[in-house]
């Protein structure tokens, strides 16, 4: 009997010690790979445990470059998790977009490294006996070229909605997507990183108070596209239970690179690694320093307007491929066949997707426009817009027929609408349609409010690409510079997103009712005054549907 009493007292001491750690300023979390020491912060009076720079893979360097991620090495003792890890190597404009999307009170300058497969966890402090909390995993956007976990502070969302917020980062650009189309470099390294992070969450999130059986993926732009793509991948099946795509889906035509070997050879030529043997080519690229890889990336001029080049030869960005591992077929094909994860899906767009940020990054001119110059611009970007040379006159007629050639304001507006509809809006509505037809719950939105407090862009009369992010992460509270109505909108959106994470339905409490997307095509217009809309951009979407069906 004495040994039973001794064992009981020991177990009680262990539980009390672990419990106490969660309620100290230096909380501990016991993962499968070792113990982490985080820090405790307060959002108002609510304590949040924060763990930063948590490894979910071995560093993807040396022989691990252009290879699938492997689980991290276990460590002895207690690992410090109170500072951000470096972010993945990326284009120089990543600093600008990080400043643009930053949800911290103060901007965090980025530090770059190829050793970058880390995530951050923001978790509410649980009272004894509390159930495990829903988990929300954020996929940053950035045209597959930029993006970082340290840009996003999940503490406001975690505190106000009692969810565990995980923010991941993955390899980018050449390092994240290079593919030779064969076994030497199948590609999709970034998506394999994402899947590795999801597997880490399944194995370890209980140590932070998260429920591995209630995981929601949410992301923006290219991050949203990856989420949409992973919904068609058997590798990701069972690793999440709901999905949210903000301004991006795998229906976007450029999500899949059709001829990856052609792109790889162009990169290899610029790097001095060109060879008929893909093994020698890849081995050569592995010998480059990170700085050399980024110099090659700059020479590729990703996501920049190529006005003098045949658009068929332009590589807009590195992106996923059909590799037979992550994707057995193009996700568009799988979506049309209803081969998609059986989970609820919330998705939407902003009403001014191509207003300032994307033209600024692309160096797309938005002044001194004439219809003649617009025609040339559209031809230069035709592969991005998914239109042929023969279709361009039809597109010009649809969007510019009633606009005077000297009315700069209207020309600019219609060009912005054209680009947004061709890239984000039409593909989002198609994705909503496919998921609805597959028989799973769908909720559609259009966000319409300008994001306050962003220092690097001019004020607009609507929501630019990414403007919704701050409202979902509670920036009106953490950063200030917001009206009471904007704070109310942020509270509303955090509640919608968290309700969806909890139940698969954004509705609940006193929130304005959000109807499910069905054959009536109802959606929610998110603004200071929230209302239900029907058939988003009906006339223009009918035009794009006719154009792509002919």
Swiss-Prot record:
Its EC number is 3.1.1.-. It comes from the Eukaryota. Keywords: Disulfide bond, Glycoprotein, Hydrolase, Secreted, Serine esterase, Signal. It is found in: Secreted. GO terms for molecular function: carboxylic ester hydrolase activity. Residues 1-20 form the signal peptide. This is Carboxylesterase 4A. It comes from Bos taurus (Bovine).
